[in-house]
Amino acid sequence: MIINNANLQGLRVTFSAAFNKALETTTTQKEKIATTIPSSSKLNTYGWLGDFPQMKEWIGEREIQNLSEKAYNITNKHFEMTVAVDRDDIEDDNLGMYTLQMQQMGQSAKEHQDILAIGMLPGGFKGLAYDDKPFFATDHAIGDRTYSNKGTAKLSAESYGAARASMASIRNERGTALNIKPCLLVVPPSLEAEARKILTAELIEGTTNPWKGSAELLVDANIVNDEHPDNWFLLDTSRVIKP
């Protein structure tokens, strides 16, 4: 192939098509645990609502309730992946391997979204949330109340049940239940067998399993790190803002 602008543009079109096809067809898990919010600026400020009002009977004048808003700033990051195409391969029309490489790049780019999104779960033990505490902490505040969304027990039917009960017990400033409904259990591959037993077995240790079918299972290696090799997470992903 003669190297000129027209031929190079043709290569760009071919490589872009291969990349985009793989990008579109590769499936991800991030939609199960995170809400996608479009961004059109370098820095985005999100107003997190500490306590959203609930419906009540309308008697007399409206009672206007102020939203407890806290600012949470996120600066967008840029990511890149670059490969070189050898000039000799262009001149010799030896480009088939590069087309496959572009497809692999598209697949890797899509999978990187899972690495970032699902990787935020183990990152939540140190990364600060909107209240300047780690996302998973034992002393989050709602008004003059505090609640914990962090545990240390290894995954078992007992600890799973305790986590469900703890989540369901969380109330707002006025003492009304937040109606949290755990529906997704996220585990690393090392805990898949135990998780499947909890969610699918008819019996556990000879007694009826009350947790059969109580949640969907997501197995993902991105929640493992050296500090927390046996991480497991129970999430309510039924809300507009996940988790």
Could you say what each language-model-derived stretch is?
Residues 41-45, 69, 73, 88-102, ...:
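Short, charged/polar micro-motifs that form catalytic or ligand-binding hotspots
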Residues 20-77:
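Assembly/oligomerization interface modules of large self-assembling protein complexes
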Residues 88, 93-96, 100, 107-169:
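Alpha-helical scaffold segments that mediate packing/assembly in large oligomeric complexes
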Residues 76-91, 143-146, 179-182:
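Glycine-rich, often proline-containing surface loops adjacent to acidic residues and nearby aromatics
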Residues 1-43, 230-231, 240-241:
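N-terminal catalytic cores of peptidoglycan-degrading enzymes
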Residues 80-82, 103-107:
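Contiguous, well-ordered alpha-helical segments that form the cores/surfaces of helical PPI scaffolds
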Residues 51, 71, 86-90, 110, ...:
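An acidic- and aromatic-residue-enriched active-site/binding cleft used to recognize and process polar
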Residues 2-3, 9, 138-173, 179-243:
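Sequence/fold signature of self-assembling virion shell proteins
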